[in-house]
Design a protein with these regions (language model features):
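Substrate-binding pocket helix/loop in short-chain dehydrogenase/reductase
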Residues: 93-97, 101-106, 203
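Short, small/polar-rich loop/turn modules that mediate ligand/substrate recognition or access, typified
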Residues: 172, 177, 233-235
Length: 261
């Protein structure tokens, strides 16, 4: 098992990608701590998995980041890996640059970016005194390939990519690695809820592999960065998107239409 006896803290982990990460890490032998605001839901999940425990964290309350890390250290003695899975978007409100309100922008920055900064800072202070560790940020392909909408979400995720590299450089002296995983369109409950058939078909046209990703596939990438197999890897931005963003199919379509004329 790749992660045997590693202590791994996963934030925002009761559903979707976060839950898939918890399950995969547990399967690989890790002792996993689910950080969540809904402790009842977290405990229900933990009860179904071996080696999984719960700690409280509310991303809207800055004081809970240091207490979250302290709770894990008190129980396990140390933290080997932090997985920052914070992320929120505001469909229908997070629009283009000209039409997104300042509060929507600040909400995304606070939850998506500030949370990663504060959780990473709290964990790194501990890791620096205990031989190092690995910080893994779940960003988004939306922070790598600019969109025509979701200016707040995309900007916050792009900043996480920068922060990942900065942490990697500045904390290397403490043997702390930091990498990011950028999921593309992933088949979670939240995505399926807001995805119309028309939009699904349109989006799939722009994914070379022709399908949405699975939460378990994102979890596999996380396990790599959490494992000793990536001991010499830091500051990397790994896109797991089925090839989305590699090409410009819209441009190709326009060229073909022009030629046909």
């Amino acid at each position: 098992m790749r992660l045997k006896d590693k202590v791994i803290l996963v934030t925002a982990s009761t559903r979707g990608i976060g839950l898939a990460i918890v399950r995969k890490c547990a399967q690989e032998g890790a002792v996993v701590y689910m950080a969540a605001r809904d402790m009842e839901r977290a405990q229900e999940v933990a009860n179904t998995l071996d080696g999984v425990k719960c700690v409280y964290n509310d991303a809207t309350k800055p004081e809970t980041f240091s207490s979250m890390v302290a709770d894990v250290v008190k129980d396990a003695g140390h933290i080997d890996v932090l997985v920052n899975n914070f992320g929120t978007s505001n469909p229908g409100k997070d629009l283009d640059f000209a039409n997104t309100g300042p509060q929507i922008f600040l909400d995304s920055v606070n939850l998506n970016l500030r949370s990663v900064f504060m959780a990473s800072q709290a964990a790194a202070k501990h890791m620096a005194c205990h031989g190092g560790g690995s910080i893994i940020n779940i960003s988004s392909v939306g922070g790598h390939v600019p969109d025509i909408s979701q200016v707040a979400y995309g900007t916050s995720k792009a900043a996480i990519n920068y922060l990942t590299k900065l942490i990697a450089v500045q904390e290397a002296r403490h043997r702390i690695r930091c990498n990011a995983v950028l999921p593309g369109m992933t088949a979670t409950e939240a995505v399926e809820k807001h995805l119309s058939d028309d939009f699904r078909n349109l989006f799939l046209r722009h994914i070379p592999l022709g399908r949405m990703g699975l939460p378990e596939e994102i979890a596999e990438a996380v396990c790599y960065f959490a494992s000793d197999a990536s001991a010499y890897t830091t500051g990397q931005i790994l896109t797991v998107s089925g090839g989305f963003g590699l090409a410009t199919p819209v441009y190709g379509d326009l060229v073909n239409k022009a030629v046909r004329r």
